[in-house]
Amino acid sequence: YCCGRTYLSAGMVDKARAEAERLVTALYPLARSGVRIVGLEPSCTLALRDEVPALLGTAQAEAVAEATLTFAELVEADRPDLPVPAAASRRPVKLHGHCHQKAFDLVKPAEAVLRDIAGAEVEVIETSCCGMAGAFGYGRDTYDVSIRMAEASLLPAVRAAPDEAAIVADGTS
């Protein structure tokens, strides 16, 4: 199943709507039963919470949206039940927030989970659009622009990170 975000980004609204309807049809029984729907890809997860309800305008899409959360939100919400590692490392972590995470103020839960549960010393990399999300960074016509955008702030910050630092970014896009 697909949330339809990739089609929507390309202006293919009818195809996006069809994919969103298929996904909502599959997820609605779970949402109705109180099951939390956890997404690992910020663009898709947040499409379920924002674009899909607007695109479909149905109670089912709204129910799925209300049940959907990011992995970091799930972990942060269930924090009291999670054991804190006895030997939590104070390893430095450079966190790159996905544009959709930034737009919905959802970098904070990822930062909190890394800091409070994993014991990491987290620094959020301050960036504008990295130019690499979705299909943009892969496109023949947009690849060079994508690289220039990444070089504006993200890639220099990654290169400047200490050797022992972990670089963390949610999702696959």
Task: List the predicted regions and their residue ranges.
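Iron-sulfur cluster-binding electron-transfer modules in prokaryotic oxidoreductases
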Residues: 1-173
